[in-house]
């Protein structure tokens, strides 16, 4: 056994699982050396989820990043000789129309994100999976790339560790738990183990079920929780005796019953001669905190394999027997069956990336077998390059607000996630029921009195529309289609479209309290912002202005989209709620890396913002401000920031518009917000829900949203947001940005599409939500640009002012011409679209005259 080292560049905690082993492999592939892996038990693990995982991979989901990591992982396993690409089936039972629709939606997502899933008939299902009762299913999905990691992901982890050790650049140590972390001045310095201390520059936590306990050593928490996942075995099943196969027939998912099943191949293989049936509890999932996990000497099988009571699964098992009677014919192997612990997360994404509190401490936690090599690659690239080849906003641990890392919040959200692992289908606009009313505007009670239809973002309760405005439907109803399809109409309120139309005729007040607001001050505050921002921030001419700008990553791709208020003594960043935490932590890290003397403070809960917009915004606002003439166009130019007084309160007014109308953003102290809201409402301005601001009018104005339309997979010119000139000062990503500008044209450009016919085959007008593939009308193939990036809608909404379904999508340069006809697919049906605008060009008020009026 190698001597335990006292120094390393990187220590991987939890190296015995498939995630830790994958991280080790990819770090070495990126040129790292002197890497040490430790594990609380065996290497490969005999106690973690990897030790009991079902090890199957389905390629298709509704999330691009998940499809990418799974497809990468499948290829990775296959190149190692450890993947049986046997295919996977998903079925919809007769009578379960919701599941059949979900299967159609999933096939469509596959076309968008690059999987080969297709629909299949009951006869095809029976042919591929003879154990099924054909008359019980109405159809299904065939995923040809689905399959099984063979013989086990546990064995693959062991092989990866052996190969890593053979390089001489890596050493692993079993039965070596991390007892504490050594942290000095906010930076990781090492790990304490029973074998001694090991000093290091970086620690990567891949401890799976125990990940939260390691994070606790750094004074933080991870929003993940282990849940019981019943895994049952029936046998003996000798169909594949003598074949040597680890699996004979395709995988089967019966997600309407929240279950799956598969054979385990030849009885002579390690797990063989059985039928495995697994289930995810929908109504009463059993979660546990990692502190409740037992040690392996305290439990029959292992800490991640808890005893299973047959009563827990009797009802779904009876339904499974109806579909596949063999489960009732074979013997139930109680000794081999168990509750396997796996992890769910508070928002569907794992905890990846650098700690919020400790520099050099990294997490890769809550990752399933199907994604492990892909996530291992992302972490290695992230640590090496500071970026990944696909946008990682959805998995970045920096995305979480402090309240989202509190134990009660984590348990509530994880319980909701556990109830929806397989069923029911999760809507793109699905709200959470727990963790609500955490952050509310100072005029929240007024919004409740108006009958606000609330959703939540970043903890803020946001009304998407107001019941009190439904009288407007009498006036505007003929311009606002009724959404007959329940899925299209779910979590949408028709009144919000009426509010938009009313605002554009008169004036509306919009609650923008969800803004993430960050103050940057100190001697080097301008130096910091000049480095991270594409736009010029310094110079006396910018004082008193709001500067719309972007952060780029090291490769010149779009990392952030925000506004900087240049104040006399500091800068104030106004950001979206979704992107705010990541941008806050990014600023702090850059400042530390560069040695800038700055103070960066999140003041989101101290400042409240209200938008007042419409053709009568100025005249209405003039009735409640102390100095009415101060709002005249001559005295208050576009993009200026000036103090005004409303209801005796000092308000910082920013003349800008995200809704394409004349008006201002009004920023004030939180405690002054109610008085200002009441004063604005006293003018007769209607309350307008956030739907208009965040979706419908934003789309009509061709305005881009970070983490949806703006991603680190595309550059600023492809988003058509590059400034006419590049500033003299250096900034992050500048060299790459200059290279992109030298191209004759970009590989892709963000375009606006209009649906020219939205009526489906049943005669029902559709109003799509989610990501739709953009396809060639002749071939039906999804468009792919010169860099291999696929075209799908990044935002989509019905625009009541233009009277059309409109979407944003990156199109290959050669397809990006106004008037070009293309197709999109929605729930398996094809709809025609036309390119209405190439690049940043609004459909509503294309000359942008209204905001400047």
Where are these regions (language model features)?
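Active-site lid/adjacent beta-loop-alpha segment flanking the redox-cofactor pocket in flavoenzymes
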Residues: 220, 237-360
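Glycine/proline-enriched, intrinsically flexible loops and inter-domain linkers
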Residues: 401-853
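Beta1/beta-strand and adjacent pyrophosphate-binding region of the FAD-binding site
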Residues: 4-19, 36
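C-terminal catalytic lobe of FAD-dependent flavoproteins
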Residues: 303-427, 431-435
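Flavin (FAD/FMN) cofactor-binding and adjacent substrate-gating region
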Residues: 79, 84, 95-174, 180-187, ...
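Central helical "cap/lid" subdomain
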Residues: 193-250, 687-688
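Dinucleotide-binding Rossmann-like beta1-alpha1 core, especially the glycine-rich loop
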Residues: 53-128, 256-261, 267-273, 300-303, ...
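Glycine-rich FAD pyrophosphate-binding loop
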Residues: 28-49
